[in-house]
Amino acid sequence: MPRRRRNTVSRIWSSALNAIDIECPARLHLGFIDPGASSGRRFGSLGLALDGLGTHLRVQRVRTAREAYFAAGERAGAERERALACLARLRRAFDFDAPLAIELLDAIPPHAGLGSGTQLSLALGYAVARLAGRDAAQRRIAQHTERGARSGIGIGVFEQGGFVVDGGRAEQTAVPPIVARHPFPAAWRVLLVFDAMHAGLSGEAEASAFRALPPFPARDTERIAALTLMHVLPALAEVDFERFGPAVTEIQARVGDHFAPAQGGRYASPRVARWLDWFAARGAACHGQSSWGPTGFVMTASAEEARILIEAAKAARAADDPVRFRIVAGRNAGARIVESRDGAPMHAS
């Protein structure tokens, strides 16, 4: 009998419920398997949850007639309008009008290819659903918040963390199902390459780009599927970075070249592209772009290898180069959720 996949969302709660605190991870989207549906299912995605970079919010009932919103930090403040728009959709979906305070303590950089919108929507959706006494299943919330139309990766990392693969969409699919999940090796690292001067495609611009692209070649789908099943996933199971890295890089090249007409090249940001070429010339075997970018990544087999690369890059970077670097690990757990109702509802000022 197949073993049931473990949901690694961590929840802590008390017997009564008044407030919910959620911290959920950013993710890399490592490419589509079949955006042209030549296999009979469309899209199919590979992704990885990231540790040390995520969205953290707290939602609490308040004694006030109007909504209260609190934000801490530049990234969190920039997400105010998106959070309130998402809340409005959730209120309609759940027919729930109790006043709430939202404190956004940290946020994934928006429009950077790291899943900021999906994680914010899932976290806020879970909190509102629980406070409203409604179904808090992530796939239901994704539908209410108009997430997961093309990829189930964001939902997968919210629920489980780790390295996940979704099975794409059939005609009746609401949200693409997660069909494989492996823990990301603890020793491996991800060096992120940020370009704050460039924004990846999203919303209607993203939808228009998909419509304008030519059909995805069936031979590329066949190759990416083979790389995923026979290289990437076995390499994770066997902690074999030498097999894993080149397979991910090849997937990235095939997908990036297909999307090049929409994003201006294999990578969206010319600055990030130059740095990825720079890392590759120094032996980095695993590199690419997350989603529509502009964030690029280099994966390494150890923290020391990542440290050597980032120190060399910082030494070579010009003073006026806006590109920044950061080393993170993979995250093998989903969202951390604390539910509580200790004392009376807070008063919002």
Locate the predicted segments by residue:
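Short glycine/threonine-rich catalytic loop with a Thr-x-Gly-x-Asp
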Residues: 114-116, 120, 220-222, 285-291
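ATP-dependent small-molecule kinase catalytic core of the GHMP/sugar-kinase superfamily
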Residues: 11-23, 31-33, 38-45, 137-285, ...
